Amino acid sequence: MINKILDAISNALNEEFGDEYEIYSEDIKQDFKEPCFFIICLNPSEQDFLGNRYLRKYLFDIQYFPKNKKNLNSELYSVQEKLFNCMEYINIDEDLIRGLKMRGEIVDKKLHFFVNYNVFVFKKGPQDEFMENIKINMKTRR
């Protein structure tokens, strides 16, 4: 599921910002091209629910490395506003998932945009064996 969400985030970023912004999800090389995004999943968790249902919580950090060093804050604020809009709903397997607890931080001249995606999953439990045959004797009373 993490990879599906990561792909959906990448698609939403590409739709919003276009092809001139590189999107990375693996280690960034030293000579990476700016402007770019780096996406990482932080501390996924799972909570038990009724039956075979589980709530998985995925926190993503979308880091933005700006191109313009002169108007740095202006560019970072502008990108952050766009991220609030494009990360609210992402499309996974023709379903929409809503981003929650969105917030942004500017640290070391780059933007960290945090968003949670919570998803219910169903796990198949052990299957019970079925009886092969059953014989029923029925008598009617009068």
Regions found by a protein language model. Give the residues of each.
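A short, hydrophobic beta-strand-centered structural micro-motif
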Residues: 34-42
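Short acidic low-complexity segments
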Residues: 24-33
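Charged, amphipathic alpha-helical segments and their flanking helix caps
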Residues: 1-24, 44-142
